[in-house]
């Protein structure tokens, strides 16, 4: 059984723009799958359809054999609890502490009123501190999040997903706004938790060299369709040119070695 299955998935926006066209994909547990393609190719739409931040128009998406497309109420909340999300612009409460932001990953496990009052049990705080230690910012736990650098804020996002105890992490252009050194640190963190914890990573990346260096699998999208799906080791520059529909520009390669 695949951990994520896209079955005949299509997405048409109200303005009639076609975001996804009949997508059929299976993502296995423990994969580090990278989605690549030009801006507007459907990368974010595909990624965000997994946890239903974007609802699809037709088809069905399954998480560990259960349809998230048809899930509602508590069943949907329980499925989403298993899927962490990392955004390009961090999506943190900037005036809150690092620890409080990481603890927000536990919201799906408790009544809303407890979370509003900040009544997190001791076990949750231990999980949050462990997650911060894993991404090497435990010493920042009591600082305000907006006092940290962009790279450190993205690591808070990763720690939040870990504290959530997600088996799947979706990362939507998580390093697009970071410098090369910080990019390497964040990507190394994602690879480490993928390899050590077996967490499945599905990530959108703009840069070709990052996709090849960190991904185990490349999924190429063009105009909402999958035009390449194979091992990262076999994704040549010619294949990337086919995905992009043109020659790859130097500023789209960006390695981190």
Swiss-Prot record:
GO cellular component labels: plasma membrane
An example molecular function term from Gene Ontology annotations: ATP binding
Keywords: ATP-binding, Cell membrane, Membrane, Nucleotide-binding, Phosphonate transport, Translocase, Transport
Membrane topology designation: Peripheral membrane protein
Annotated positions binding ATP: 37-44
SUPFAM superfamilies: P-loop containing nucleoside triphosphate hydrolases
Compartment(s) where it occurs, according to its Swiss-Prot or TrEMBL record: Cell membrane
EC number: 7.3.2.2
ABC transporter domain mapped to chain residues: 4-248
Catalytic activity: phosphonate(out) + ATP + H2O = phosphonate(in) + ADP + phosphate + H(+)
Coiled coil location: none
InterPro entries attached to this UniProt entry: AAA+_ATPase (IPR003593), ABC_transporter-like_ATP-bd (IPR003439), ABC_transporter-like_CS (IPR017871), ABC_transpr_PhnC (IPR012693), MetN_ABC_transporter-like (IPR050086), P-loop_NTPase (IPR027417)
Subunit (UniProt): The complex is composed of two ATP-binding proteins (PhnC), two transmembrane proteins (PhnE) and a solute-binding protein (PhnD).
Family: Belongs to the ABC transporter superfamily. Phosphonates importer (TC 3.A.1.9.1) family.
Job of this protein: Part of the ABC transporter complex PhnCDE involved in phosphonates import. Responsible for energy coupling to the transport system.
Protein name, entry field: Phosphonates import ATP-binding protein PhnC
């Amino acid at each position: 059984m695949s951990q994520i299955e896209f079955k005949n998935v299509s997405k048409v926006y109200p303005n009639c723009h076609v975001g996804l066209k009949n997508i059929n994909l299976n993502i296995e547990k423990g994969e580090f799958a990278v989605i690549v393609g030009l801006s507007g190719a459907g990368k974010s739409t595909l990624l965000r359809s997994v946890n239903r931040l974007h609802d699809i128009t037709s088809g069905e998406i399954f998480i560990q054999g259960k349809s998230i497309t048809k899930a509602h109420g508590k069943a949907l909340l329980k499925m989403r609890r298993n899927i962490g999300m990392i955004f390009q612009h961090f999506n943190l409460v900037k005036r809150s502490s690092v620890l409080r932001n990481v603890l927000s990953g536990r919201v799906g496990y408790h009544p809303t009123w407890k979370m509003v009052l900040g009544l997190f049990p001791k076990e949750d705080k231990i999980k949050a501190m462990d997650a911060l230690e894993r991404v090497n910012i435990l010493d920042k736990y009591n600082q305000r999040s907006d006092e940290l650098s962009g790279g450190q804020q993205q690591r808070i996002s990763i720690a939040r997903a870990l504290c959530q105890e997600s088996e799947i992490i979706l990362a939507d252009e998580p390093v697009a706004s970071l410098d090369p050194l910080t990019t390497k640190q964040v990507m190394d963190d994602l690879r480490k938790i993928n390899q050590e914890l077996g967490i499945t990573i599905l990530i959108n990346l703009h840069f070709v060299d990052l996709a090849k260096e960190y991904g185990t699998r490349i999924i190429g999208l063009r105009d909402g369709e999958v035009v390449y799906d194979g091992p990262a080791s076999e994704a040549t520059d010619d294949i990337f040119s086919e995905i992009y529909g043109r020659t790859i520009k130097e500023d789209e390669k960006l390695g981190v070695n």
